[in-house]
C-alpha cells in the first residue's frame, strides 16, 4: 500500500516542464524518483514510503516516511529515492505543480473513509459517490482507504484505477490493502460492506458465526487504530448482529457510533406508500423500519405521513397496509433477485449515501429516519444490549437522538416483539464473539433475507 498525501487546498496542474528529476538515469525501475518541483506558492507535500503488497493478515510496523522540506519560497526539494516500487495509481503516485486557488483554500480538512468489501458490487457504485462529493459535500476532500482480500486484490487494483481515471478533484488519497489494522488507521468513517454470502446448505447459525468472526476482527482493528470517534456503518449481513459483534470488540469507541443499515428497507417502504397514494416519494415522511434487517422487520405505517397527514387517513385500506404493504417491503429483495438475477447493489449504495447524509445534515423539522443502533437508553421498551432499527433524528454532527413522539398499537407492538425476540436469539448465537460466554443457538425460524443467500 502506498500513499501520496496532498494538502487539502492544493490543486493539480500537470505542468510537467516544471518537474525536474533529481534521480540519475541509472536509477532502478523499482525506485520512486525524487523531484525538484517549482511552485508559484508554498504548499506542503509529503510522501510516505510504500511497502510491498500484503499477502497475509499481520500488522506491520509504521512505514518509514519521506518528507519534503521547503528550501525557499518557490522550491520544494524531495530527498533520495525510495527503495521499493509503490503500490499506487496515477495521480496518487505522481508529483505535480501544485497551486493554491481560492476554491480549494475554502475546503474542509481531509476526511478518512474506510470501506471494506471495496472490490464488490455495492462498493463499485458507492465509491464514486463518495469521491464525487455527493455524500460529504462539495467542499470536503476525501481519503479513501479500501479493504479487500487476497482473492479480490487484483479487482481492488482495478477499482483504484477507475477512481484514478475519474479525475475527482475532491479525491486526494487512495490506499488499498487486505489488513484492517492498516486500512482502518485514523478512519473517521468505516463502511463495513464485505461479508461472506450464504452458501448452499449453510444454516443461518453458521453464517452468523462465520461473518461474526470477520466483524469481531474488524471491531478490534477499529478499536486499535481508527479515530476514537469513528462512525461505523455495518452493511454486511446479518447486519444487526454483525454491528453488535463489532461494537462489543471495540470498547474504546462509543457504542452509539455503530449503525446497521436499514435505510434501503425504509426507502422501499416509502416507495410503496407513494405508489399506493399516487404521490411522489418526497411527499412521504416519518417512515420507520423497526427491528432486524430480516423478514421480521416492521415497516411502520402507523406513524408515517403523506403530505403531513397520517398514512392511515390517506390510505384507508388497513388490510392492505398490514398484509400486502408489509409483505412487499419484507420480500422486495427476493423479488428483485428473481427479476435481475442478482441482489440489489446500486440501490444499497444509494441507501448508504442516504444513511450517512441523514447523520451529517440536520433532520428536517418534524421528520426522522431509520437506522439500526444500540438499544441502551431507548424510550420504546426495546430490550437493551442489541442493535435494533428505530426512528432517529440528527443535528447534522454525525450524532443522533431517539424520536420520542411515536405511537404504538397492538399490531405494531406485536410485530416489533417478534423482531426483538429474533435479535435476542441471534445474540445468544454469537455469545462467544461478544465476550459473553458459550454460544447457544436456538433461532426461532429462518428469516434471512434473500440477498444474504
From Swiss-Prot:
User: Can you tell me which residues form the catalytic site?
Assistant: 293
Q: Which is one Gene Ontology cellular component term of this protein?
A: chloroplast
Query: Which UniProt keyword terms apply here?
Result: Chloroplast, Disulfide bond, NADP, Oxidoreductase, Plastid, Transit peptide
Q: Which Gene3D superfamilies match?
A: Lactate dehydrogenase/glycoside hydrolase, family 4, C-terminal (3.90.110.10), NAD(P)-binding Rossmann-like Domain (3.40.50.720)
The main place the protein resides is plastid
Question: Catalysed reaction(s)?
Answer: (S)-malate + NADP(+) = oxaloacetate + NADPH + H(+)
Keyword field contains NADP: yes
The cysteines joined by S-S bonds are 88-93, 429-441
Q: How is its activity regulated?
A: Chloroplast NADP-MDH is activated upon illumination. In order to be enzymatically active, disulfide bridges on the protein must be reduced by thioredoxin which receives electrons from ferredoxin and the electron transport system of photosynthesis.
Residues binding substrate: 198, 204, 237, 268
Q: Which Pfam families match?
A: Ldh_1_C, Ldh_1_N
Site label Activation of NADP-MDH, positions:
88, 93
Keyword Chloroplast tagged: yes
Per UniProt, NADP(+) binds at 117-123, 211, 218, 235-237
Q: Which PANTHER family match?
A: MALATE DEHYDROGENASE (PTHR23382)
Assembly and binders: Homodimer.
Q: Which family does it belong to?
A: Belongs to the LDH/MDH superfamily. MDH type 2 family.
Q: What does this protein do?
A: The chloroplastic, NADP-dependent form is essential for the photosynthesis C4 cycle, which allows plants to circumvent the problem of photorespiration. In C4 plants, NADP-MDH activity acts to convert oxaloacetate to malate in chloroplasts of mesophyll cells for transport to the bundle sheath cells.
UniProt name for this protein: Malate dehydrogenase [NADP], chloroplastic
Q: Which organism is it from?
A: Flaveria bidentis
Classification lineage = Eukaryota, Viridiplantae, Streptophyta, Embryophyta, Tracheophyta
